[in-house]
Amino acid sequence: MIPGEYQLKDGDIELCAGRERIQLDVGNTGDRPVQIGSHYHFAEANPALDFDRVKVRGYRLDVAAGTAIRFEPGQTRSVTLIPFAGTREIYGFRGEVMGSLDSTN
């Protein structure tokens, strides 16, 4: 292998294969663009974004790691979300969870 070389598998690679997916319409009611990154807890996204936050608790964007989706002012677009995996613990963001997504608290 040459340093920095990529050795890619032939064919398509499906991201998050077999994971549950939900579709959601999201509108930006603000006067500034809003960008949401791939692993941001979508329910805690900018309050200017209009969508059902209860429905998407524990979900993130179904996009490649390190990428994002931008919502321009007044724009409504459909996004696909997938649930967080692993320990399903959320810390930080806007501080609305700060622990297990699966707890009943």
From Swiss-Prot:
InterPro entries attached to this UniProt entry: Urease_beta-like, Urease_betasu_sf, Urease_subunit
Pathway: Nitrogen metabolism; urea degradation; CO(2) and NH(3) from urea (urease route): step 1/1
Top-level taxon of origin: Bacteria
Record has Hydrolase as a keyword: yes
Keywords: Cytoplasm, Hydrolase
EC number annotated for this UniProt entry: 3.5.1.5
Matches recorded under NCBIfam families: PRK13203.1, urease_beta
Family: Belongs to the urease beta subunit family.
Stored HAMAP family: Urease_beta (MF_01954)
Name recorded for this polypeptide: Urease subunit beta
